[in-house]
Amino acid sequence: MFFFGMKTLIKKYRSRTIAELNFTENPSEIYIKKTGTYAVCIIGGGYANNKGDFDLHITNNGNKLDVLEKQMKFKFRHKGKLATEFYHFEIKNMGKYKFEFKNIADLEAKESMLLSKRMFQNTLSVNNVGIVIKETSSNTKFIIGLLMAVFGFNIAGLGIILAFNPQLYM
């Protein structure tokens, strides 16, 4: 149980970066070689929020993909900067995809994820914010992996305690 949970967490941690984008190069085209779930991540801020109509349109040969804002916005480090998973989408066919961001001014990105610090910070400018497209997994898979790692570690620890203290059985 512990090893399966840790395998899932390590896979999430080591997910591969597909492309780095800037808001200035709008729209951008990326060739995606593998099917699966991908995330659009905001680099430079521990907090990212859609204040209004900030949106992402992804098309492949004229077909629009469903892009959903993540409920649980995981944080990670990308080249020393804090990044936040913001959108996720599913790729079913390999090919060239066009990424177009709409209403970029409605994106609110701040350095700190703490509410008490965030109240006194200004919103980061678009020039200081970057975009990364990376592989990801679903939230439920991550939570199940985390729970399996914690429970597996606790069960293994309890087994070791009981193995070296046989008087606990009596």
What is each stretch, according to the model?
Residues M1-M170:
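Acidic, Ser/Thr/Pro
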